Structures are given as structure tokens and as C-alpha cells.
């Protein structure tokens, strides 16, 4: 690695320790030419995940955008920010574990709704109403019936 002081190659690692909650390694280095000490960080390179939107366009996955959508759906509900962050973590981990670099917005929505249905039914319905773009009351009522049927089946188990 080039020294930021003398720009010569060759440095030795003086100290290494975990950083960024274990997601990086902080290394103190010393230039073998001039003795200058400097710090470097080593991180895993995460492949960007592209979201294929309904209209066919692609955009980079934005964790914050997903978080905002779930926060909006769970507004004034007994769902804390830690629980919402955990939902976002689960969805993002699931998307990355599927492999590949592209995922449809539909799949993201399905993952979120599956988790939200178990966390808070009102937040689920709010999220579904935006995600599924209900055209009329019948479509909305069908979704409610599906949720109620699922709840009934779960209580029988």
C-alpha cells in the first residue's frame, strides 16, 4: 500500500482491531521508507442490490426508503423503531441471501407484508393498501378477509 506521506510502496501493519461493530478491520500501518504511521480500514465489499420497479426501471436498493414505508404504516401503532429496524434487517438479509444482484419491488413488498402480518395487523393493512394499490373497496375487503382467515387458521393450530 502506498504511503500517504512519501507515496512509496511498502508498509507494515503495527496494530489490527475490529471496527464498525465487527464489519470492518482498522489497521495502523507504518511506512517502511519514511516511518510515517497511518490508519486504513478493511471492509467487505457489498454488491449493490438493484430493485426492479413495477414500471421496469431499476434503482439501487435503499434501506432507508423501506424503513420510511414501514414507519409510515406503523404510525400510532404499538410497533417500536427497534422492531421496525429488525423487520428491515430481516427483509434485507432475505434479499441478499436469495443471491443475484436484482430483485423485484413486488418480492420486497411480499416479504414485508409476510412479516408485518405477524407483527401488527393494522400496520399490515396500511402497508398492503399502498403496496397493492387497491382499486376499490372490494379489493380492500378481499385483503381483510384473507387476513382474517389466516388469523382464524393460526388460532386453530
UniProtKB/Swiss-Prot annotation:
Organism (species): Ligilactobacillus salivarius (strain UCC118) (Lactobacillus salivarius)
Gene Ontology biological process: negative regulation of DNA-templated transcription
InterPro entries: ATP-cone_dom, NrdR-like_N, RNR_NrdR-like
Domain of life of the native organism: Bacteria
Protein name (database record): Transcriptional repressor NrdR
Entry's family note: Belongs to the NrdR family.
Keywords: ATP-binding, DNA-binding, Metal-binding, Nucleotide-binding, Repressor, Transcription, Transcription regulation, Zinc, Zinc-finger
Gene name tied to this protein: nrdR
Keyword tRNA-binding: no
